Amino acid sequence: MAEDAPVVQQTMLEPEVLLKKRKVNERTRKERVEQAIAKKEAQKKNRKETFKRAETFINNYRQRERERIRLNRSAKNKGDIFVPDETKLLFVIRIAGVKNMPPKIRKVLRLLRLSRINNAVFVRNNKAVAQMLRIVEPYVMYGIPNLHSVRELIYKRGFGKINGQRIALSDNALIEEALGKYDVISIEDIIHEIYNVGSHFKEVTKFLWPFTLTPVKHSLMEKKVKHFNEGRKAGYCGEEINELIKKQV
């Protein structure tokens, strides 16, 4: 009889073990439900914030454009020429250079992240960048992108660098995870930061993978720059860069 006691005790313990396990499972399930609800609420809040920001950005862009048009008209009426503030944003496209490049040229192109022909990047227009562009001028075209070009490039050709991989900017959650600490939580925030050369321009451009553009015919490039670049096929092209972007996006 004494030998049967452990069996009886084990039988009595089984319901208690199952009950504890059931309670743990219920608690875990409840926590998951609560987490899912909290995540859904956070996503809803972020969507509202994203829409609100986008609306604010668009209103600001429109206001700036109206002011630019007003100043331009006012200058024309007075017989003057309206000269806008020095541009802060440039878009650089690599158009040449494969073999027999001097080491210095190759190094600067690498610093600009233009490792291949038809790679392109946004850069801040400052003294250091201007010096680099002068060095590689025979191998690049660069100019002033407008808001439409910035939007088209980021929406259609934009990829982010996440864990060393090239990831499409198709989910704001990925953007928030990578750039949320800079208060950049959506693709519209990226556009705003780039176009306005904001305080976190460096972090955002570093996050963006260099753009890969569609090749265009050599004659088109020559035509685009000939009249303002003395027949050269490379270099600064001002706002004409937007026509080239339109062909290559």
From Swiss-Prot:
Alphabetically ordered keywords of this record: Cytoplasm, Nucleus, Ribonucleoprotein, Ribosomal protein
Further remark: There are 3 genes for uL30 in S.pombe.
GO biological process, one term: maturation of LSU-rRNA from tricistronic rRNA transcript (SSU-rRNA, 5.8S rRNA, LSU-rRNA)
Compartments where found: Cytoplasm; Nucleus, Nucleolus
NCBIfam families according to UniProt: uL30_euk
Gene Ontology molecular function terms on file: RNA binding; structural constituent of ribosome
Keyword Ion transport part of the UniProt annotation: no
Protein name (record): Large ribosomal subunit protein uL30A
Entry-linked Gene3D superfamilies: Ribosomal protein L30, ferredoxin-like fold domain
Predominant place of localization: cytoplasm
Organism: Schizosaccharomyces pombe (strain 972 / ATCC 24843)
